[in-house]
């Protein structure tokens, strides 16, 4: 399978919303991901396999050729930097917002600010672009605790409904960007396997447009 195609996905919402789009490109999983501990899955197309990995690892696997294609959130791409990746398609799924947030009714300090986030590079660029000095604190989860315990003045995190912020006495402040999942392709694979990859992109793009028009 020298010309086989490897697609990197992550478990959760992105996987669930990507599988129907892949199905319209003729690619369906043979096994049930939820019932298996495997990380590499065959599909109904004998020349295509799917990797199930951490969401934050998808750009890295695609960049360095561990996978030819991948689906990941724009937030992850912004944090990763996108080097060595071709981003041909916004899949318009897993939509949310990347925002700053802090204690309800409180204003952020005028001077140096402490910010908790898992998006360290992204947050550093964002505050620098605003001309604000920020100490970025790396956390891996439960961002809402940081302002509550005075670990940070603000957080930078993904916001969907905003209910989690509200339940913890926080409120969204500034919108950094609208986020959705993107199809990314290894640049070398796009050249060497164009004949196999381009039809996948075209069929998924058509599926996205049909959903947009429905």
Curated annotation (Swiss-Prot):
Keyword entries, A-Z: Amino-acid biosynthesis, ATP-binding, Cytoplasm, Glycosyltransferase, Histidine biosynthesis, Nucleotide-binding, Transferase
Record InterPro entries: ATP_PRibTrfase_cat, ATP_PRibTrfase_CS, ATP_PRibTrfase_HisG, ATP_PRibTrfase_HisG_short
Intracellular or extracellular location(s): Cytoplasm
E.C. numbers: 2.4.2.17
Gene3D superfamilies associated with the record: Periplasmic binding protein-like II (3.40.190.10)
GO BP annotations, alphabetical order: L-histidine biosynthetic process
Glycosyltransferase found in the keyword field: yes
Pathway: Amino-acid biosynthesis; L-histidine biosynthesis; L-histidine from 5-phospho-alpha-D-ribose 1-diphosphate: step 1/9
The keyword Cytoplasm belongs to this UniProt entry's keyword annotation: yes
SUPFAM superfamilies recorded: Periplasmic binding protein-like II (SSF53850)
Any one GO CC term of the record: cytoplasm
Enzyme class: transferase
Reactions mediated catalytically: 1-(5-phospho-beta-D-ribosyl)-ATP + diphosphate = 5-phospho-alpha-D-ribose 1-diphosphate + ATP
MF term (GO), any: ATP phosphoribosyltransferase activity
Oligomer and partners: Heteromultimer composed of HisG and HisZ subunits.
Family according to the record: Belongs to the ATP phosphoribosyltransferase family. Short subfamily.
Domain observations: Lacks the C-terminal regulatory region which is replaced by HisZ.
Function of the molecule: Catalyzes the condensation of ATP and 5-phosphoribose 1-diphosphate to form N'-(5'-phosphoribosyl)-ATP (PR-ATP). Has a crucial role in the pathway because the rate of histidine biosynthesis seems to be controlled primarily by regulation of HisG enzymatic activity.
Protein known as: ATP phosphoribosyltransferase
Lineage, highest ranks first: Bacteria, Pseudomonadati, Pseudomonadota, Gammaproteobacteria, Pseudomonadales
